[in-house]
Amino acid sequence: MSNDLPTKKDLVKWDQEDALNWTRGEYEIPNSKACGGEADGKAIYFCGNSLGLLNKKARQHIMEELDVWSTSSVTGHFNHPYQRPWKHVDEPLTPHLAKLVGAREEEVAHTSTLTSNMHNLFTSFYQPTEKRWKIVIEKGSFPSDWYAVHSHPRLHDKVLRPEQIDNAIIALVPREGEDTLRTEDILKVLDDNKDSIAIVWLPLVQYYTGQLFDISSISPKVHEIGALLGLDMAHGIGNVECKLNEWNVDFAVWCTYKYLNAGPAAIGGFYIRSGLEDGGRRLAGWWGNDARTRFHMSPNFQPTPGAKGYQHSCTPVFSSIPLLATLQLIEAVGFSNMVEKARRLTGTLEALLKASRYHVHPADPKGKIGFKIITPAAPYRGTQLSLVILPEEEHVMPKVFDRMLRKGLVGDERKPSVIRLSPVVLYNTFEEVGRAVEIVEEALEEEEEERKR
């Protein structure tokens, strides 16, 4: 993209020339009015970082599974007319997921939900001692991660003293006046606490700011001090390149309902590095038993080698099958091509937003209606841009968000003051990016006019 701002004609032309433009036709685009808009027609859906859209083949796959349930019932576990027997429903997904996260197939499991998987892995790999018991986590982490991490030191009250439990969490905070964490500041915290840290827990992409963490620089320091590195990849998988093996990450969890379009509250997954020892601490369930003997109903647990040995219950069919359609589509188009298009889409959104008269600069007068972008510049981000709606102290964000929604732009709000916009490669367009910026400006202009009355 040149330094000149693209015109509407440019945006239409880019869509026409886009080699991936056909993938939009694979998805069902929501109706604006059904989403709270004032007019009928397709919404501009920039909320795939919260819930991805329905793939048309996913609808087909779900209907097929309903038919199997109807006609074959329990025998669908073993004999399946579409060659997806339910007892092996995760197997077609594993190769795709492993490739997507940069891992070996035996290191990946497809099961449960993100926080439950997080608890599962922390139970095995958080093994505090008198000298090494602390967990590093960002202060602004997603609340479920924050709650989960805080709960684990309390489970070790036979090993840890009350004062150790009270001081088990090291919370990373940005510098004063900044919105995101600097890598050098994270490394300093690790150095300053090198003898007491057991686990470093970070997101790959931060849910609120959209920051992509430099894991390749952080991981060596984590292991140098003798700690383990765990990642929350909820906003990373399907959004940015993931290289868990290359980065030497110890364990990770993710969900599939955002960029992988598996549906509301769909199934999660996790990764465990080959060779990572759990010290005999494992929460066992029959789906973690060796698949060759699982249905023998033996009282003796024989874990499946690798990550699948940490599964508990059988794989939910109806929250797994929708995932297959998007994984197959990603394989067809090539994830590297998606990353390149995402760079252009989000870069265009950023450029147009920064050219807006409502983009607030530090030198602008205090109290001005507008927004600032707190998401880092490329390459330290994925598709998401987070806009802080100003002035923050006047809490105008909900009104601006509602105006945007009524005009047909579906983003999402994160209290206290952020609106997140995420143009997703598989179904959003450059023309939509241009219109989205216009809607942001219209919503802010209405707020500005209301203040003058």
UniProtKB/Swiss-Prot annotation:
Name of the protein = Kynureninase
According to its UniProt entry, this protein's organism is Cryptococcus neoformans var. neoformans serotype D (strain JEC21 / ATCC MYA-565) (Filobasidiella neoformans)
Q: What is its EC number?
A: 3.7.1.3
Q: Please tell me which top-level EC class this enzyme sits in.
A: hydrolase
Coarse class of the protein's main subcellular location:
cytoplasm
Catalysed reaction(s)?
L-kynurenine + H2O = anthranilate + L-alanine + H(+); 3-hydroxy-L-kynurenine + H2O = 3-hydroxyanthranilate + L-alanine + H(+)
**InterPro entries referenced in this protein's UniProt entry, alphabetically:** Aminotrans_V_dom (IPR000192), Kynureninase (IPR010111), PyrdxlP-dep_Trfase (IPR015424), PyrdxlP-dep_Trfase_major (IPR015421), PyrdxlP-dep_Trfase_small (IPR015422)
For the modification N6-(pyridoxal phosphate)lysine, the affected residues are K258
Quaternary structure, per UniProt, is: Homodimer.
Family note: Belongs to the kynureninase family.
